[in-house]
A protein has these predicted regions:
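Intrinsically disordered, low-complexity regions enriched in serine/threonine
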Residues: 1-55, 127-319
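Short N-terminal secondary-structure initiator segments
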Residues: 1-12, 97, 108, 113-121
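A short, surface-exposed helix-loop junction/capping segment
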Residues: 59-84
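Short, well-ordered loop/turn elements at secondary-structure boundaries
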Residues: 64, 117-118, 138
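Generic structural hydrophobic/aromatic packing signal, biased to beta-strands
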Residues: 69, 122-124, 144
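Amphipathic alpha-helical segments
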Residues: 83-107
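Ser/Thr-rich, low-complexity intrinsically disordered terminal regions
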Residues: 102-132, 233, 252
Length: 319
């Protein structure tokens, strides 16, 4: 089975997905680039093809409307894109955090590449942290990710990680998704993205105010079942009823005391606990071919969408 993860680096404890090279704290950006497998560039070349006929070998022709992107180190192709496609280099993802780590107190915690270099990301802790009742701690992060295969715009996203279980949840505030997305048809301006994202205490405080509200909202069994039905509705339309029932039963078991931190006062019998049962299922329990497939889904794919839906439905309970 080929792995999605090409290379990755992290500090502190082994990440929940169990992948990567461990670094010491406060390593320079240059060390991160090497250890995270991000010390290469994305190169461009014309799309070429061989014309052939029965009488000859033909000749090399080009297709001017598109270009091939490939790695500078291995020369492996990454994708074919239009000429309008604006490349974001691996170094730009890490450089985004240079002033944040050197001046603003951020600390890089993980960075790496997926799918042979098609997806690139870095995650840094902001230094913001909040505690709900029962000593339930969540820390604030900013995730920056991009893809050169057309599957992901360059995205800067506020993210929270609950310490007791390492569940990840994208921060969303009202009409704002807590994210800034830059299409590859436009150039990536790191400083403009930071200004638009509004890396500030108020964003984190507003999010944790919502989480506090969820932790104080007690839920009854029928409410929990209705919530899970709404969250998993699109998934349960596909596949067998048995698979749907197993998913719901697994998440309900996590909520009902079997999940990490499920017995904390903030989570036991509350909407916050119900939300975290879904995020734990996506991050840790949901079936995946490999841990790197799980990471890909939880941060960028179907799992991320499922967690977003779970948050939306949870907030309805306290609206």
């Amino acid at each position: 089975m080929a792995h999605l993860l090409e290379q990755m680096a992290y500090i502190g404890d082994v990440p929940w997905h169990g992948l990567g090279n461990q670094l010491s704290a406060n390593e320079p950006i240059e060390v991160w680039a090497q250890q995270a497998g991000m010390d290469w560039t994305i190169c461009e070349a014309p799309v070429s093809f061989m014309t052939q006929d029965a009488a000859s070998l033909g000749k090399i022709a080009t297709f001017p409307e598109n270009k091939v992107l490939f790695r500078s180190d291995t020369k492996m192709p990454l994708s074919v894109v239009s000429q309008r496609f604006q490349v974001v280099q691996p170094s730009e993802i890490l450089e985004f955090y240079r002033d944040l780590t050197e001046v603003s107190g951020f600390e890089l915690e993980t960075a790496g590449v997926l799918k042979g270099g098609r997806k690139i990301w870095a995650l840094a802790r902001t230094g913001q942290s909040s505690t709900l009742k029962g000593n339930d701690v969540s820390n604030g992060y900013v995730l920056l990710a991009t893809a050169c295969d057309g599957t992901l715009a360059t995205t800067a996203q506020f993210t929270s990680i609950r310490v007791v279980c390492n569940n990840t949840l994208a921060v969303a505030l009202g009409a704002s998704s807590g994210a800034v997305k830059v299409r590859h048809s436009t150039s990536f301006d790191a400083q403009a993205v930071k200004r638009q994202l509004g890396i500030s205490v108020s964003t984190w405080s507003s999010f944790m105010y919502q989480m506090k509200g969820l932790s104080e909202r007690k839920v009854k069994m029928h409410e929990a079942m209705n919530y899970l039905s709404r969250v998993f509705f699109d998934e349960t339309k596909v596949g067998s009823d048995n698979a749907s029932n197993r998913t719901t039963a697994k998440v309900m078991a996590l909520f009902d005391g079997h999940g990490r931190g499920a017995e904390l006062a903030s989570a036991k019998g509350t909407a916050f606990g119900l939300l975290n049962a879904v995020t734990e299922f996506v991050d840790h329990e949901r079936r995946a071919r490999t841990n790197d497939h799980r990471l890909e889904s939880a941060w960028f794919g179907q799992g991320a969408s499922l967690k977003e839906k779970a948050l939306e439905q949870a907030l309805v309970m306290i609206a």
